[in-house]
C-alpha cells in the first residue's frame, strides 16, 4: 500500500451449477491464493456461489439456503485473511429475491449491493427471478450481522484514504447510465463488477472496450470478474474473461476459456492526482451514500505491473509508428499555420548534425510541403565553431542536400574571438562564458539571416533540455517558433528513427542512422585530439532516459521524489543502481527549479503530448520557487 499501490485480483473459480458447497470450496481456495499473492481485493463472478445459469432453480429455497451456507464458509475464511472479497449470490430480502454482491472483509459482511439493471432480452431472463435494487439503503440481518443493503455503499480504507471501493453488477456497466458513474462522483476510485457475461463472437473486444472506457471516463480502477467455464450449459458458453483497467489502460486480463485470475496493482494516488488536476471532475459528493470504513495492514506492495522506462514512447511497434507519424504531422501543421499566418516566405534553422536540429528540419520540410512551397524556402545554416566535429558537419551537409533545402555555412569562430576581445575574455578559459558566447552568436546569425530572408527562425530545443534548463538564455533558448518544445529527448530519437525507417532514399536513411549514433552534444568545447566529440551532454547532466522518466512522473502525476525513485528502481533495474538514480534525480530537481526563469519566456510551439512546459498552458510556476522540500526528501532517502 506504500506509494498508493493496492494489489487487486479478479478471478473465475471452478464452478458447478447449483453445487453451492463445491463453489464455496473453490472460491475459498481462490481467496487463499489471492491473499498469498499479496492482494487485498478479490472480485468474484456474478451469482458465483450458486451459478448464474441455475434458471428457475434460483427461486428454490433450497438453493437460496445453499448460497447462504456457502457465504458463511467464505466469511469464515475471510476472518484469517487481510483481504476484501466480493462474491455474488441470490439473496431474499423482505420477500423479494435480489441478484447481489456481498462484500466480505476479515469476518465481517461490510455490505450487500443488489443489481440495479436486470437484462430481460435475448438469452437473459433475470426479471423472471429477480427484483431490481430498491431505492435507498437499509439494514438487513445476515448470518448474525447487521449489514447495509443498497446500491450506494462506499467502502473506504482507513489507512489509504484514496482507496474507496464501490460495486456494480454485470449489466449495470452495459447501460446508458451505469451506477459506477454515480459511485465515482461520490468518491470511489476503485470499482468492482461481479459479472456473468456469456461469450459470443466479438463480445470480448466489446467487453474490453467497455471496461477500459469506463475506467478512463471515471479516472478509476475497474475490476471485472466474469463467470467461467463451469457456467457453460444449455445454450450459453462462458469464457471467464477477467479484466482490470486503470484510467483507460488495460493492466491485466485472463485468456478466454480458462478459470484464471487477473492480478495487478492499482495506483490510487495516481487516480486521485488525475482527478485533482482535471478541474471539470465534480467535487466528491457522497450525499445519500453509506460510508463503510475498513482497515488493511500497511505494507509495501510488490509490483508486478509494467513500469515503462520510456513513458513517452509506446512500447508496441505498431502503435509507436502510428504515434510518430501523428506527432510529425502535428509539428508540421503548427509550423505551417505560423508561416501561413504571417505570410512568411522563408524559414531559417540552425543545423548542427545533431538529433534536435535534424528533427526540426524534417518537420520544417513537411510544413513547406503542406504549403505547396519549394523546399529551397527552408534555409538551413551550419555554423561551425570551436567544438564542431567533421562528423556532425558532414552529416548536416548531407542531410540538407538529400532534403533539398538551401544550405548556408557561416563560421562563428572569428566573430566569437572578436567578442572575447571586446569583453576581455581569455579564449583559453573554456568556461560558461566561452560556451554561451558561441550559442548566442549562432542565434544572432540565425535571427539576422531571417531578417535578410524575411523569414522566421525555427527553434530546435526539446522538452528535456527545457526541463533541465540545458539551453543558453537568449541563445538556442530563443526562436520565433519552437517545433520541438514538447518533444522529450527519448521521443526525439524515435521520431528520427521513424523517419529513417520509412524514407525511400538509402543515403538519407544512412545519414539519419549515423545522427542517431552520434553522442548528444552542444559542441561548445574543443573536440578531442582525434577529432571526436569531447563534450557529451549525458556525462554532464545525466542520462536523458532517466530525466525523461523523472519529468513524466513529476509533471504528469505529481509524484513525490520517493515515489519517483521507487518507480525508477523498478523500471531501470539492472541498468542503473539506486545511487546513480538518486544522483541524477537530485540533479533533475535542482535544475528544474533553478532554470524555471528560462521556461517563463519560451517562444510559441505546438503542444504534442500531455506533458509540456509552456508558461502559457500546461506549466505555470514562479521562477523563484524553492526546491528545499523536494531536495530534503531526497536527502532522507540516502
Can you annotate each of these PLM segments?
Residues 1-350, 366-375, 402, 407:
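Enzyme catalytic cores with a strong preference for nitrogen-chemistry domains
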Residues 6, 18, 23, 163, ...:
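ATP/NTP-dependent adenylation/nucleotidyl-transfer catalytic domains that generate, transfer
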Amino acid at each position: 500500500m506504500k506509494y498508493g499501490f493496492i494489489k487487486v485480483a479478479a478471478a473465475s473459480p471452478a464452478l458447478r451449477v447449483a453445487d453451492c458447497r463445491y463453489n464455496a470450496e473453490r472460491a475459498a481456495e481462490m481467496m487463499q491464493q489471492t491473499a498469498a499473492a499479496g492482494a487485498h481485493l478479490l472480485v468474484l463472478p456474478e451469482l458465483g456461489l450458486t451459478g448464474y445459469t441455475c434458471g428457475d432453480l434460483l427461486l428454490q429455497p433450497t438453493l437460496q439456503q445453499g448460497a447462504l451456507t456457502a457465504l458463511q464458509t467464505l466469511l469464515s475464511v475471510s476472518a484469517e485473511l487481510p483481504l476484501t472479497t466480493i462474491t455474488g449470490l441470490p439473496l431474499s430480502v423482505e420477500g423479494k429475491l435480489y441478484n447481489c454482491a456481498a462484500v466480505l472483509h476479515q469476518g465481517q459482511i461490510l455490505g450487500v449491493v443488489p443489481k440495479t439493471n436486470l437484462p430481460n432480452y435475448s438469452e437473459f431472463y433475470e426479471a423472471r427471478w429477480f427484483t431490481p435494487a430498491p431505492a435507498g439503503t437499509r439494514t438487513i440481518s445476515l448470518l448474525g450481522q447487521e449489514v447495509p443493503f443498497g446500491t450506494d455503499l462506499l467502502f473506504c480504507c482507513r489507512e489509504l484514504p484514496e482507496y474507496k471501493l464501490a460495486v456494480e453488477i454485470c449489466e449495470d456497466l452495459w447501460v446508458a447510465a451505469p451506477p459506477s458513474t454515480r459511485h465515482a462522483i461520490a468518491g470511489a476510485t476503485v470499482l468492482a463488477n461481479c459479472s456473468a457475461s456469456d461469450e459470443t463472437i466479438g463480445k470480448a473486444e466489446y467487453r474490453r472496450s467497455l471496461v477500459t472506457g469506463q475506467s478512463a471516463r471515471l479516472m478509476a480502477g475497474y475490476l471485472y470478474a466474469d463467470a467461467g467455464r463451469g457456467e457453460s450449459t444449455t445454450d450459453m458458453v462462458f469464457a471467464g474473461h477477467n479484466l482490470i483497467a486503470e484510467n483507460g489502460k488495460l493492466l491485466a486480463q485472463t485468456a478466454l476459456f480458462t478459470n484464471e485470475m487477473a492480478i495487478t496493482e492499482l495506483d490510487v494516488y495516481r487516480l486521485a492526482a488525475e482527478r485533482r488536476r482535471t478541474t471539470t471532475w465534480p467535487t466528491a459528493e457522497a450525499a445519500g451514500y453509506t460510508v463503510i470504513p475498513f482497515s488493511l495492514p500497511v505494507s509495501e506492495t510488490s509490483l508486478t505491473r509494467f513500469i515503462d522506462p520510456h513513458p513517452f514512447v509506446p512500447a508496441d511497434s505498431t502503435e509507436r509508428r502510428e504515434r510518430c507519424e501523428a506527432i510529425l504531422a502535428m509539428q508540421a501543421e503548427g509550423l505551417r499555420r505560423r508561416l501561413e499566418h504571417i505570410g512568411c516566405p522563408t524559414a531559417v534553422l540552425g543545423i548542427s548534425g545533431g538529433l534536435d536540429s535534424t528533427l526540426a528540419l524534417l518537420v520544417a520540410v513537411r510544413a513547406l510541403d503542406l504549403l505547396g512551397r519549394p523546399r529551397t524556402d527552408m534555409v538551413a545554416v551550419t555554423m561551425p565553431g570551436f567544438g564542431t566535429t567533421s562528423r556532425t558537419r558532414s552529416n548536416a551537409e548531407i542531410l540538407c542536400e538529400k532534403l533539398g533545402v538551401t544550405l548556408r555555412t557561416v563560421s562563428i569562430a572569428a566573430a566569437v574571438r572578436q567578442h572575447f576581445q571586446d569583453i576581455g575574455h581569455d579564449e583559453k578559459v573554456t568556461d560558461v562564458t566561452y560556451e554561451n558566447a558561441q550559442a548566442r552568436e549562432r542565434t544572432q546569425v540565425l535571427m539576422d539571416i531571417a531578417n535578410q530572408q524575411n523569414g522566421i527562425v525555427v527553434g530546435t530545443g526539446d522538452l528535456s533540455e527545457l526541463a533541465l534548463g540545458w539551453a543558453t538564455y537568449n541563445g538556442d533558448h530563443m526562436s520565433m517558433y519552437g517545433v520541438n518544445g514538447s518533444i522529450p529527448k527519448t521521443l526525439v530519437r524515435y521520431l528520427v528513427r521513424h523517419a529513417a525507417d520509412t524514407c525511400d532514399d538509402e543515403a538519407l536513411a544512412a545519414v539519419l542512422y549515423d545522427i542517431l549514433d552520434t553522442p548528444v552534444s552542444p559542441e561548445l568545447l574543443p573536440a578531442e585530439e582525434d577529432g571526436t566529440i569531447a563534450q557529451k551532454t549525458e556525462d554532464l547532466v545525466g542520462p536523458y532516459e532517466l530525466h525523461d522518466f523523472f519529468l513524466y512522473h513529476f509533471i504528469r502525476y505529481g509524484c513525490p521524489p520517493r515515489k519517483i525513485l521507487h518507480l525508477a528502481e523498478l523500471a531501470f533495474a539492472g541498468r542503473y543502481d539506486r545511487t546513480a538514480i538518486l544522483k541524477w534525480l537530485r540533479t533533475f530537481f535542482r535544475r528544474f527549479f533553478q532554470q524555471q526563469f528560462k521556461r517563463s519566456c519560451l517562444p510559441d510551439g505546438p503542444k504534442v503530448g500531455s506533458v509540456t512546459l509552456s508558461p502559457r498552458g500546461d506549466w505555470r510556476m514562479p521562477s523563484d520557487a524553492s526546491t528545499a522540500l523536494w531536495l530534503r526528501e531526497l536527502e532522507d532517502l540516502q
